[in-house]
Amino acid sequence: MKVKIISVGKVKDKGLNELINYYAKQIKTIEMVEITDEASITGMEKEGQKILSKIAKDSYVISLAIEGKMLDSVEFADTLDHVTTNFGPSITFIIGGSFGLSHAVKEKSNLLLSFSKMTFPHQLMKLFLVEQIFRAQAILNNHPYHK
């Protein structure tokens, strides 16, 4: 599985960056791309165009959105397994900025995924996502990390 995470904004907290990097190193085949946060509702469209330009044509796109489908960790692992088996090894995850994702990005997405009905800062979502990708790999490989 080849993973790309496109996120709006930078993770400024050193501790969060260390945790994100810890899990990213465990995943190995991961690329993280940061898009400049435009910090306005009108800037969301500009962010969307930048995001779309970073998505590989053969990639399965999963965007994090509050209205998306909620999965538990095992269902998430099964989804990633299904995607890589049926659509190829390339998966792109997208984390929007404070105003969310543009309509164009949501339309390009193969799956809208929600971690909760609550709203979280994009910095925390990046950590949650990287950890869940690592956990999914552990589940699929019968590794004891997932209890």
UniProtKB/Swiss-Prot annotation:
Location of this chain's protein in the cell: Cytoplasm
Keywords: Cytoplasm, Methyltransferase, rRNA processing, S-adenosyl-L-methionine, Transferase
Entry-linked Pfam families: SPOUT_MTase (PF02590)
Catalytic activity: pseudouridine(1915) in 23S rRNA + S-adenosyl-L-methionine = N(3)-methylpseudouridine(1915) in 23S rRNA + S-adenosyl-L-homocysteine + H(+)
Sequence positions that bind S-adenosyl-L-methionine: 64, 96, 115-120
A single Gene Ontology CC term: cytoplasm
Gene Ontology MF term list: rRNA (pseudouridine-N3-)-methyltransferase activity
Positions of disulphide bridges: none
First-listed, main subcellular location of the protein, grouped into a coarse class: cytoplasm
Record bears the keyword Cytoplasm: yes
SUPFAM superfamilies tied to this protein: alpha/beta knot (SSF75217)
EC number: 2.1.1.177
Stored CDD domains: RlmH-like
Entry keyword annotation includes Methyltransferase: yes
Function: Specifically methylates the pseudouridine at position 1915 (m3Psi1915) in 23S rRNA.
Assembly and interaction partners: Homodimer.
Family: Belongs to the RNA methyltransferase RlmH family.
Name of this chain's protein: Ribosomal RNA large subunit methyltransferase H
